[in-house]
UniProtKB/Swiss-Prot annotation:
Signal peptide: none annotated. It comes from Erwinia tasmaniensis (strain DSM 17950 / CFBP 7177 / CIP 109463 / NCPPB 4357 / Et1/99). Disulfide bonds: none annotated. GO terms for biological process: DNA replication; DNA synthesis involved in DNA repair; double-strand break repair; SOS response. One of its GO terms (cellular component) is cytoplasm. ATP binds at residues 30-37. It is found in: Cytoplasm. Keywords: ATP-binding, Cytoplasm, DNA damage, DNA repair, DNA replication, DNA-binding, Nucleotide-binding, SOS response. The RecF protein is involved in DNA metabolism; it is required for DNA replication and normal SOS inducibility. RecF binds preferentially to single-stranded, linear DNA. It also seems to bind ATP. The keyword Translocase does not apply. This is DNA replication and repair protein RecF. Belongs to the RecF family. GO terms for molecular function: ATP binding; single-stranded DNA binding. PROSITE patterns: RECF_1, RECF_2.
């Protein structure tokens, strides 16, 4: 699976772009503020329905315009699929697949699995549990057909329960939510635990290649104590939750803890080592997906040289090439990505929102 063509209209500082893409490496080179990251963000938005630098649609629509339009062509083993996303300033989206409207963003996400590596991506390691939950949930989404529906219902029920906690005085008044919520929580927790266990060996092997100097450990915490059924815990903790006006324990508090020599990685590793660990986690997850269902991820890497010395850049480049996946890399200068280039790759020069293929020397 690869994007063969990308059309961008009125997205960030890009007025119009029509890019024929390489199935391997695609390099975006240009000065800061030129629009390199905007291209990566357009690809990400096409597969997620939202940008990674802003959750507000109005901020990514080009000034004086009412909407952005993204269109792509995806090459599969059987045929090419046309996909499109339009979003206006009110946040209303229209998804089109093979010429038909009425599709969901989740369908795009299934068709375009992506791994994003940015300078801000350290939050996976030093941010709150929600970032590591998102990492595990990405894997569950792509491996468990029922996960997204269950996860969406869980979020809805938790929101309703939290609103009800502000109004009720007795547990019986909230029992109906809990009877629906508890089985979903148990199922989602089981999926997360199974995925965490299944991918652990892949993560460990990749981390051993990237950071052999550390003994790393990974553990999934489901968000409530192991001894309790979630339904029982909700009833037992009702008075506490009512006082807090929110549900204090549950799958929305789960975490995937990562330690080095028994210490949280953010307390021990340098920024360069943290970036390598982040890359290892993303690569391991993408490669695991390929082995599970044959799908290859797209890898989006913003500011490739940031935090990495030459040796580490070589290591990451070699591992990315070994995936045989489609990779999009931004860099300020071509020499930062020189060791990644080959005859199958394509280099684009980006300046002031204009994108042009850079001719080969």
């Amino acid at each position: 699976m690869a994007l063969t063509r990308l059309l961008i209209k009125d997205f960030r500082n890009i007025e119009n772009a029509d890019l024929a893409l390489a199935p391997g490496f695609n390099f975006l080179v240009g000065p800061n503020g030129s629009g390199k990251t905007s291209v990566l963000e357009a690809i990400y938005t096409l597969g997620h329905g939202r940008a990674f630098r802003s959750l507000q649609a109005g901020r990514v629509i080009r000034h004086d315009q009412d909407a952005f339009v993204l269109h792509g062509r995806i090459a599969t083993a059987e045929r090419e699929i046309s996909v499109g996303l339009t979003k206006n300033r009110a946040g209303d989206s229209k998804v089109r697949i093979d010429g038909s409207d009425g599709h969901k963003v989740a369908e795009l996400a299934q068709m375009l699995p992506m791994q994003l590596i940015t300078p801000e991506g350290f939050t996976l390691l030093n941010g709150g549990p929600k970032y590591r939950r998102a990492y595990i949930d990405w894997g569950c989404f792509h491996n468990e057909p029922g996960f997204f529906h269950a996860w969406s219902n869980l979020r809805r029920l938790l929101k309703q329960r939290n609103a009800a906690l502000r109004q009720v005085s007795r547990y019986q008044q909230i029992r109906a939510w809990d009877q629906e919520l508890a089985p979903l929580a148990e199922q989602i927790s089981q999926w997360r635990a199974a995925y965490s266990e299944a991918i652990a060996a892949d993560i460990s092997a990749t981390c051993a290649q990237f950071l052999p100097e550390f003994q790393l450990s990974f553990s999934f915490q489901r968000g409530w104590d192991k001894e309790s059924h979630y339904a029982e815990l909700l009833e037992r903790n009702f008075e506490r939750d009512r006082a807090l006006t929110y549900t204090a324990s549950g799958p929305h508090k789960a975490d995937f803890r990562i330690r080095a020599e028994g210490t949280p990685v953010e307390d021990l590793l340098s920024r360069g080592q943290l970036k390598l660990l982040m890359c290892a986690l993303r690569l391991a997850q993408g490669e695991f997906l390929t082995r599970q269902n044959g799908q290859r991820c797209l890898y989006l890497i913003d500011d490739f040289a940031s935090e990495l010395d030459e040796t580490r850049r070589h290591l990451l480049a070699a591992r990315l090439k070994a995936t045989q996946a489609q990779v999009f890399v931004s860099a300020i200068a071509a020499e930062h990505v020189f060791d990644m280039t080959d005859e199958k790759g394509k280099m684009f020069h980006v300046e002031q929102g204009k994108i042009a293929v850079q001719p080969e020397d």
